[in-house]
Amino acid sequence: MNDLTAIFLTCNDLPEEWTKYHKEQLLKSLNGAPLIVMSQKPMEPWGGNVTHVLQDAPRSFSNIYRQLLRGAKMATTDYIAVVEADTLFPPEHFLQRPKKRHVGYNMNFWHLFTWGEPIYMWRNRRGNYSMLSDRLYVIEALEERFEKWKDGTPDRMTGEIGRPMVEHNLNITVRDVDEFETTVAVVNFQHPFGSDEMQRNQRKRGGLVRAYDVPYWGKAEDLIKHFK
């Protein structure tokens, strides 16, 4: 893959064993594609086709998108894919190529909560962790966002590129979206280390579509054991 760069955003706050497992799975799925790791704390070099960069602002919802803009400008490929530290990606995810001048979102994903019964849950909602998009279109969207909000966007108004409610509230252009689905799902973990207050308080609810076992990732009760 020479036309895609993955941008890995991390606050370095997840369990050590999980971090090792996540790295192993990510590098396997990327299969040598360029990766930019943007971390809040210094990290040991990963080697290979990996660039390490320290984030230049404290943790916040707005900072997620400010760092994404930095990473998108560092990349030189036609496409970029967001990688988050609590999300697992199948190799197939990074092979997708949404329409140009659209923000792409993989809509085949499961949430897996680290509290309560181990079960996969699905909600029909675009998530930044599953974004794979035309790089220049992402830069255009985020430059407009931060030109309008030079000091950063308020947490209560911050959200994904291409979500109409978010962009209407920010008074910026509502961006075109190209939703796609892979055969194997992305898995996003919901945990008390997250930025979302509902997650930290373990009060966040999952969707009504649920499964105990899914292709490729296996049983929820087995996969959740890696988050430790």
Model-derived features: where do they sit?
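Short, flexible/disordered intra-domain loops and linkers
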Residues: 14-21, 54-62, 123
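Short aromatic/hydrophobic "clamp" motif used to bind/position activated sugar donors
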Residues: 80
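N-proximal low-complexity "stem/linker" segments adjacent to membrane-targeting elements
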Residues: 1-21
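Short catalytic/ligand-binding loop motif for oxyanion handling, primarily in non-cytosolic enzymes
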Residues: 15-17, 44-47, 89-92, 113-115, ...
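Conserved catalytic core of nucleotide-sugar-dependent glycosyltransferases
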Residues: 94-227
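Active-site-proximal specificity loops/subdomain of glycosyltransferases
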Residues: 37-76, 93-95
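Short, acidic, metal-binding catalytic loop of nucleotide-sugar glycosyltransferases
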Residues: 20-33
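The conserved acidic donor/metal-binding loop of glycosyltransferases
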Residues: 84-88
